[in-house]
Amino acid sequence: MLKFIFKRLLEALPTLFILITFSFFLMRLAPGSPFTSERAYPPEVMANIEAKYHLNEPLYKQYFLYLENLSKGDFGPSFKYKDQSVNDLIASAFPVSIKLGMVAFAFAVVLGVTAGTLAALNQNSRWDYILMSFSMLGVIMPSFVFAPVLVLIFAIYLGWLPAGGWNGGTAMYMILPVASLTIAYVAGIARIMRGSMIEVLHSNFIRTAKAKGLSMSRIILKHALRPALLPVITYLGPAFVGIITGSMVIESVFGLPGMGLLFVNGALNRDYSLVLSLTILVGTLTILFNAIVDILYAIIDPKIRY
C-alpha cells in the first residue's frame, strides 16, 4: 500500500510542473502590463519599474528566476498591493477559502450520501421522487444563479441571514455561501449514490445477508455501504475541484475576503505574481486531492492497486 501511495504522489509531480510552466508563460504572454494605466509613465520610470521586477529580462530568465523563488516558497511581490508580498496576501485569504470549501465539501458528501441511500431504500416511492426532483434542480442550477436567489429570499425578503460579509467566519455568515456551493454537489452525489446503492442491494451477497435474518440497518452499514461508495469516491475528485473553483465565484458574490476576491482583483489589474500563484495553489490542491481520492479508492477496493 505504501508503494502505491508513493507511486501515486510521484505521478502528480510532472502534472504540477506542467501546470506551473503553462501558467507562467500564458500570464507573461498575455497582452498588456501590470503597470499599464490611463496615466502614462515616463520611459525612464517605466524602465526602472520593469528592472525592479525583472520584467526587462528575457522570458526564459524570468521563468527560471520564478522557479528558483518558488522552490524557496517565495511567490514574489504583488504588483497591485504595494509593499505586500503574495505570500502575505495568500496567508490572509487562504483560511477563508479553505474553510468555506471544506465545510461545503463535508456537507455535500454527508447530505448527498444520505439522500442517495434513502432514495435507494425507498425506490419508486414518494420520497424517491421528491429527493430526485430536488437533485435534478440542483444539477441544472449553477451556484452563481442559486446564490442570488438565496440572498433574495433569506437575506432581503425574510431578513434571517446576512447578505454578505465574513465576520470571522461565524455560522450565520457561512450559511448562504455554503448552501450556494453545496447544492449542485449534493445533487450529483445523491444521484450517483442512489444508482450505486440500488445495484448493490440487488447483489447476491445482500440476498444472503437478508436470508440470514440481518436487520436492514446492519446490512446497509456493514455490507452495502462500502461497495456503494466506490462510484461516489470517483466523483469526489471533480467535485472538490468544482467546489474550490466555485468558491472563487461565490466569494465575489458574497464579498468574502478569500482567494476568489484576490484572483478577480489580480486578473483585472494584470497582477502576474498574484494570479499565477493562486492558479498554482488551486492546481496543487486539485492534484493533491485527486491523488488522495485514488488512495482512498485503493483502500476500499484493493483490486486496483498495481
Curated annotation (Swiss-Prot):
Which key words are in the record?
Answer: Cell inner membrane, Cell membrane, Membrane, Peptide transport, Protein transport, Transmembrane, Transmembrane helix, Transport
Q: Which Pfam families match?
A: BPD_transp_1, BPD_transp_1_N
Task: Supply the name of the protein.
Answer: Oligopeptide transport system permease protein OppB
Q: Which residues lie on this side of the membrane: Periplasmic?
A: 30-99, 157-169, 251-279
Q: How does it assemble?
A: The complex is composed of two ATP-binding proteins (OppD and OppF), two transmembrane proteins (OppB and OppC) and a solute-binding protein (OppA).
Q: What does this protein do?
A: Part of the ABC transporter complex OppABCDF involved in the uptake of oligopeptides. Probably responsible for the translocation of the substrate across the membrane.
Per its record, what are the GO molecular function terms? peptidoglycan peptide transmembrane transporter activity
The membrane topology term of the UniProt record is: Multi-pass membrane protein
Question: PROSITE patterns recorded for this chain?
Answer: ABC_TM1
Q: Where located?
A: Cell inner membrane
